[in-house]
């Protein structure tokens, strides 16, 4: 696995060590390099058809140097040594000392826990296997409730490959798959129009697209429609709020988190 990442980023163990020496040359206390190759594919369904497909690729490396609590950071979208050395020198400017020490820690690959059942490739995120899945969910929602007037579906799949090395000699590689399916339905009854969104995300590839997951999405939206249409505005004043796991944590952060950040900084 380690050799695969060296080939992907076109860099060697010896070059990583050289970059750490370059980053610490001005007297930094600590330095690390973070290389990332990420691909993302997004399909959007509107009016019963998948009419938008987007593919993104992000590639590059960031180098960080820390000196007395100050941080210098620089990045490059190329892993050519000329550009990486320039990034290391730029990040090193945070250190004011001129007497840096060369890296002495041995190169030590870390054995990290494997959280995924397989090693993913581009084939595990093949675009056309998702088009039929999105259209099937759309059709089931349309047939399930005649109050639905519009449906928007989206799938997003990404795979990130990470390579990390620091001035302590610690080295590791990681692969991070992430796949999401989101459906929003707009429905109307007796002059009242509202909407409901269901989203599912897993650290998986295309094996996420199962009949069971489709059932969950369809059933959740169809069961929510009468509840949402019957909902009314609450009275003003204090009231108990029940928050579910997941996305509602963002609401909690926005409500009180920023105030705490201001206090603690």
Where do the PLM segments sit?
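Active-site bordering "gate/hinge" segments
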Residues: 1-265
């Amino acid at each position: 696995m380690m050799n695969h990442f060296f080939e992907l980023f076109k860099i060697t163990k010896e070059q990583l060590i050289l970059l750490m020496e370059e980053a610490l040359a001005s007297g930094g206390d600590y330095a690390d390099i973070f290389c990332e190759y990420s691909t993302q594919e997004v399909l959007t369904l509107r009016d019963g058809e998948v009419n938008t497909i987007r593919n993104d690729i992000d590639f590059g490396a960031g180098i960080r140097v820390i000196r007395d609590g100050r941080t210098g950071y620089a990045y490059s979208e190329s892993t050519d040594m000329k550009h990486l050395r320039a990034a290391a020198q730029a990040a090193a400017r945070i250190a004011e000392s001129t007497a840096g020490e060369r890296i002495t820690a041995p190169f030590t690959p870390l054995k990290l826990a494997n959280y995924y059942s397989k090693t993913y490739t581009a084939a595990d995120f093949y675009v056309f296997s998702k088009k039929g899945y999105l259209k099937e969910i759309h059709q089931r929602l349309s047939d399930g409730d005649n109050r639905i007037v519009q449906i928007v579906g989206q799938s997003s799949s990404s795979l990130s490959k990470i390579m990390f090395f620091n001035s302590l000699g610690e080295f590791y590689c990681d692969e991070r798959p992430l796949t999401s399916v989101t459906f929003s339905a707009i429905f109307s009854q007796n002059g009242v129009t509202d909407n409901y969104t269901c989203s599912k995300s897993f650290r998986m590839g295309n094996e996420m697209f199962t009949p069971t997951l489709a059932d969950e999405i369809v059933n959740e939206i169809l069961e929510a429609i009468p509840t949402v249409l019957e909902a009314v505005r609450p009275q003003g004043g204090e009231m108990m709020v029940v928050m579910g796991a997941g996305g509602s944590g963002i609401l909690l952060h926005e409500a009180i988190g920023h105030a705490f950040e201001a206090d603690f900084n």
